Every structure is written in structure tokens, then in C-alpha cells.
């Protein structure tokens, strides 16, 4: 049986992330895991059609990361206060790429993440972070769409 000593819960701070917390906490408790909660703050380098002077970009990115940390701390305090959270972290970058990188750097054993279940044009326009993580991660990824419940 695989051991999941470190579980990563990447969040986008939406209600979708909050909805899957029972799955995340159940897995963390079942395997007595250290839970890493990660928010990736999308930065300007990924908006290549907008021109903003470099100094403004650095200031903006610092504010985005600081604001993300504040919101993530609130999210954890509200939703995960009774669980085994060991790391709460905000990093700048592209969410899909940074989640996969975090898995490798931190030695994560399992990723548990939400999926919005977008289809068609929405998926083409917005992409799928979950799909990228599932197809490129070196560890198992459990995806949960909280809006698709068993009947």
C-alpha cells in the first residue's frame, strides 16, 4: 500500500476549493499526512498582451503575493483549523506549472485538488489546471468536482 506522508492541496481560494475540504481532510487523517496548502498567484508574465513598465510589474506582483497570503491564511483558519496543516504557502507563477514543480521540490506523495469540470469553449479559453497537473505530475492526483455528486 502506498504511503502518502505529504499531501498537497492546491487551492484557488474559490468556493470550489472549500467544497472539497472533506475529501482533503479525510485523506490527510487516514494517512496521518502532513498537509501542504498552496495558492499560486498568477503573475503578469503570463499576460503577454498587456504592456506595463517593469517597476510597476514588480510592485504589483508583490502586492498580489501579499494579498494571496492574507486570503490563504484566512481560508486555512476558516476551513482547515482542525486538520493537520503543516505548510501554508503562496508562490507566484502559472498555477499548473508551479503545482507540478512544488510536487517535485517538496517531495509530495499525493495531490488532492478540485476541478471545475469545464467543457467545450470554457475549457479552451480558460485551460485546465487540473488536467495539466494530472497529465504531468510524477505522483498520483485525486481530482474532485464537488458539483458532480453521486445520485
Regions found by a protein language model. Give the residues of each.
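Short beta->alpha linker loops
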Residues: 67, 90-94, 116
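A short acidic, glycine-rich active-site loop
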Residues: 55-70
Amino acid at each position: 500500500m502506498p504511503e502518502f506522508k505529504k499531501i498537497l492541496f492546491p487551492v484557488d481560494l474559490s468556493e470550489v476549493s472549500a467544497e472539497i475540504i472533506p475529501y482533503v481532510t479525510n485523506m490527510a487523517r487516514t494517512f496521518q499526512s502532513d498537509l501542504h496548502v498552496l495558492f499560486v498567484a498568477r503573475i503578469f508574465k503570463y499576460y503577454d498582451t498587456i504592456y506595463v513598465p517593469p517597476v510597476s510589474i514588480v510592485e504589483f506582483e508583490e502586492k498580489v503575493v501579499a494579498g494571496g497570503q492574507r486570503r490563504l491564511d484566512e481560508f486555512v483558519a476558516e476551513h482547515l483549523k482542525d486538520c493537520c496543516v503543516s505548510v501554508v504557502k503562496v508562490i507566484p507563477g502559472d498555477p499548473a506549472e508551479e503545482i507540478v514543480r512544488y510536487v517535485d521540490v517538496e517531495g509530495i506523495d499525493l495531490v488532492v485538488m478540485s476541478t471545475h469540470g469545464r467543457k467545450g469553449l470554457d475549457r479552451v479559453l480558460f485551460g485546465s489546471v487540473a488536467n495539466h497537473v494530472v497529465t504531468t505530475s510524477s505522483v498520483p492526483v485525486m481530482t474532485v468536482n464537488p458539483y458532480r455528486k453521486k445520485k
